[in-house]
Structure formats: structure tokens, C-alpha cells
A protein has these predicted regions:
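Glycine-rich phosphate-binding loop of actin/hexokinase-like ATP-binding domains
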Residues: 130-189
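Short glycine-rich, Thr/Ser-proximal phosphate-binding strand/loop in the N-terminal lobe
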Residues: 3-45, 49, 82-85, 160
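Short glycine-aspartate micro-motif
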Residues: 4-8, 64-69, 135-139, 145-147, ...
């Protein structure tokens, strides 16, 4: 058995588990609040504590933990293990040598990877990407990230940055983004962007189920509320998802023209909207893309859910330990 720890470093929660990288099965899941506002050191110590808890829990099985993979919501240098930039996490996460810091404290090899690249690796190996030679994965949540497999190879690009689809420009001179650019996809189709559209609709006085679901408290509106209202048939909420899907479709169309994948996988919390989001994405792609054989492209939802990033992070740790 190949047992590795996979960790998902989320903006709200830190999640961790032991994964059997031969089967994709996970054991001993743990979760704790990230509480990023308390600072880097506090977050790092929570990660260290999760690793120690899992190492102890795994001891009874007789299988040793070989390494640790951490999916981070930003740009880690996969060679050096230094976090270069985390735009969606509070605090100064610039040039933080996270890999070395944690290795020193837990005595295990640690490998960093972008969180959505981890999801991509998990889905390709054990989920919705199985059997595909070339695919693209997008995860839509607090931000929008992606991952790429080309001709049977997990493609990471320069420094592991291939797949930053959330920062494709879909509106020139549009809204300012946390990355420093303007008009990025994240500003129009991420979870916070969808929530902001919901708040705007309520403030404009439109009658909508969105307001009822939060007892008219605008501060409680998030993407999950919009998705729920849309699933209950609310036309305003459905219109919001239609608009977000249009922007996603523009970005996906551009991606298709560059990579020409067999399969496009959609994951992340917002993908729980299912066809309410997938339909406008595919509609926009069909309207805008005319040089790719779209009848051969599959548009599917991720299968592994919240476990995809954990499995993928563990798989990445195995690859690094194997020298790949």
C-alpha cells in the first residue's frame, strides 16, 4: 500500500486525509478552520497538527506515511516549494517557503501544488477524467482555477502555473481583480462574483427567492444561496447563473482553441448548480467556437467532490517522491 497525506488548504477550512494512491481510497479525514486572519504562523501550525494527527491515526494500520502533498489556493513553485502568491487568502503569503517549514517540523517529504491542479490529477486518475488522453478541469469556487492533461501527460507548465483560467480576461478594462489585472473571469463567474450579482439584484428591488432564503439579510447571500434559489425555480437566480455560465463559456471556448481537449470537467462548490450552470456554458461555446469538432468534446461534472483535491494532493506527493 502507498499511503500519502493529502491536504487541501482552503480559505475557510483546512482538510486533510490519508490516501491510498493505488486505489484512490481515503482514510481518517480531518478538518479544521483555516482562520487565515490569525496569520501565517497560526495556519502553518494547524497544518502541522493535522499531519501529526493523521500520522498517529495511521500507525495502527502498520502502513507508513511516505509523504505529504498540499494543494494551495494560489501559485506555489513546485520545484522549490515556495508559495509565491495567494490572492484569495488573507495575510501576506508572498514568497513563503512552506514546504521547507513543514518538512522541518514533521520529518516527512512535502510537495506543494496548486489546489485545482491537485483536483485535476485526482479526477484524471480516479474520477471524471479516467480514460481521457487530453482534458481540461476547471474548479469554480472562491476563485476559478484549472488544470491540464495533454497527450497523457499531466501538464504543469512553467513553475506549475499552467491552468490559471480564472485570470483569463473576459471583459477588457473590466472589474479590477486581486491578481492586479482587470476583467478576469474570476470577477464574473466565481462564487463571490455570483453572490455579488445576487446582492445587486436584491438591492435593485427585484422580487426574488434569494432574499427570502437569507431572511432579507444581504450579508448572508453567497453562491450557495443563489444556486439553491435557482434550483427552486427563481428566475432571477437562474439569470445570474446564466450570466456566469456565459462568461465561463467564453473562457472555455478560448481554452478549446488552444488545447482541443476530449473532455472538460467542471468542479468546485459552484458546480453543484449542475445543468443550470453547465447548459449556458455549453450554449455559449456552441455559439462562439466553430473550428473545433465540438461533437467530440465531452462537458462533464467532477465525480470526486470535495475529496478530489485530497486524493490529487496525495498523488502529487507520490509523483514527487518517485522523482516525476
Amino acid at each position: 500500500m502507498n499511503h500519502f497525506i493529502g491536504i487541501d488548504m482552503g480559505g475557510t477550512n483546512l482538510r486533510a486525509a490519508i490516501a491510498d494512491t493505488d486505489t484512490g481510497q481515503i482514510f481518517h479525514q480531518r478538518k479544521c478552520p483555516t482562520l487565515a486572519a490569525e496569520g501565517q504562523e497560526a495556519v502553518i501550525q494547524r497544518i502541522v497538527q493535522l499531519i501529526r494527527e493523521l500520522t498517529q491515526a495511521n500507525g495502527a494500520s502498520g502502513a507508513a506515511i511516505t509523504g505529504v502533498g498540499i494543494g494551495v489556493p494560489g501559485t506555489p513553485d513546485i520545484e522549490t516549494g515556495v508559495i509565491q502568491f495567494l490572492p484569495n487568502l488573507p495575510g501576506k503569503w508572498l514568497n513563503v517557503p512552506l514546504q521547507a517549514i513543514i518538512e522541518d517540523q514533521v520529518g516527512l517529504p512535502v510537495a506543494l501544488i496548486n489546489d485545482v491542479r491537485a483536483i485535476t490529477l485526482g479526477e484524471w486518475t480516479f474520477g471524471a477524467g479516467r480514460g481521457a488522453d487530453t482534458l481540461v478541469c476547471l474548479a469554480i469556487g472562491t476563485g476559478i482555477g484549472g488544470g491540464v492533461v495533454v497527450n497523457g501527460q499531466f501538464h504543469l507548465g512553467l513553475g506549475g502555473t499552467a491552468g490559471e483560467f480564472g485570470h483569463h480576461v473576459v471583459e477588457p478594462d473590466g472589474l479590477p481583480c486581486g491578481c492586479g489585472g482587470k476583467g478576469c473571469l474570476e470577477m464574473y463567474a466565481s462564487g463571490p462574483a455570483i453572490a455579488a450579482m445576487g446582492v445587486k439584484e436584491v438591492m435593485h428591488g427585484h422580487t426574488t427567492r434569494i432574499s427570502e432564503l437569507v431572511d432579507h439579510d444581504l450579508n448572508r447571500i453567497d453562491a450557495g444561496v443563489i444556486v439553491r434559489a435557482a434550483q427552486e425555480g427563481d428566475p432571477v437566480a437562474q439569470g445570474i447563473l446564466q450570466r456566469a455560465g456565459m462568461y465561463l463559456g467564453i473562457a472555455v471556448g478560448n481554452i478549446l482553441g488552444v488545447i482541443s481537449p476530449q473532455r472538460v470537467i467542471f468542479g468546485g462548490g459552484v458546480s453543484s448548480a449542475g445543468d443550470l450552470l453547465l447548459r449556458p456554458i455549453v450554449q455559449t461555446v456552441n455559439e462562439r467556437v466553430h473550428v473545433i469538432p465540438l461533437q467530440k468534446v465531452e462537458f462533464v461534472l467532477a465525480e470526486l467532490g470535495i475529496n478530489g483535491g485530497l486524493v490529487g494532493a496525495a498523488l502529487w506527493a507520490k509523483r514527487r517522491c518517485d522523482g516525476r
